[in-house]
Amino acid sequence: MELLKAEKPVIVSMGAYAASGGYYISAPADAIVADRLTLTGSIGVFGMLLDAGDAMERKLGVTVDAVKSNRSADLSIFRGLTPTERAMMLKSVDRVYETFTNLVAEGRNLPVEEVLDIAGGRVWSGVDALEIGLIDSYGGLKSAIAVAVDKAGLGEEYFIEEVREAPQGLAAI
C-alpha cells in the first residue's frame, strides 16, 4: 500500500464488516470511511492446529508413523502440540500481533499504548470506531469517493470506472 500511497490517496470504504485481516489491510490508508453499523477492529491474532489423532485412531483405526529431522518438524493434526511447539506457536502469534498493532499505530497515527488498549481482538461498531480513531468518517462508497476526489484535488473533472470481478466457479454459470 505504501507504493500506491506514493502515487495517489488511498481511501477505504468499509461495508458491513472489515475486521481482523480486513482492518489489517485498511489501517495504513489515507482515510477510512465506514457505516455507523460497520463491524471493524478485531485487532488480534490467533493460531490453532486441530488435534484429531485420538479420534482418527479410535473411530477409523488410522495411526501415523513419522520420520523427522528434528523434534518440531512434524506439526500434524494427528497429535497434540508439545510444550516446546506450543511455545513456538505462541511466540509466532505474539510477533504477528506486535506487527499488527504497530501497523495500526502507524497507519492511524495513534500511540502503540492506545492501540493496545483497543486491540485484543475486540470488534467495534462504526460509531465506536470513529470515537477511538479506527475510522475517519461515516458513510458508504459515495462518501469514500468524495473523500478520494477531495484528497486527490480532482475538482469537478473526474470520472469513475467501476471494475467488477468476473464471476468464477458456479457463479459463472
Each model region followed by its residue ranges:
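Small-residue-centered hinge/linker elements
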Residues: 1-11, 15-107, 158-173
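Amphipathic alpha-helical substructures
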Residues: 109-139, 144
